[in-house]
Amino acid sequence: MLEFEFLQIAVGNRDKFLCCPSDEEWRRLFYFAQKQSLVGFLFCGIERLPNEQLPKRDLLLKWYGMAESIKKVNVIKNVRCAELDAILRKGNFKGCVLKGQGTALLYPYPEYRQSGDIDMWIGTSDGRLVSIDTVISYAKQRGVQVSHVDIKHADMRFFNDTQVEIHFKPSYSYNFV
């Protein structure tokens, strides 16, 4: 399958495709990249390809533009993670970045990792769990808009340009035996 071959190129396990993709195959690869949130990551594969295997110029430029946008968004999100951590420390909370931004550093090219919001689990500075009421009270004291609260997390508007989910339970089982 061409998609898996492309993933191998992106991670450095291959240098090129066995057969050069057609224009239609490149369009399908681009659609796959968009659908799987791999536009930036697979752009790294494009950068590794020999010139004769590159997609047509219009698709290449579109892909490049989207990859550069992802990099810019990640710069902002990384700054926001540090700012959020500082805000929470002022309230004697200790945070841990989860999921997207938290796992991006495990990628060969973290700047190209597409993620949604910032997910941060918080506890007390001495490692204890915090209640939802404590988290919401602290956020509201800082003028933070709080929406969608459930049993494990709450959406909080710390920043205008970045969505944040604060997790106050590290896990929750929906299945009870």
Describe each PLM feature range.
Residues 1-116, 122-177:
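Conserved NTP-donor binding/palm subdomain of two-metal-ion nucleotidyltransferases/polymerases, i.e.
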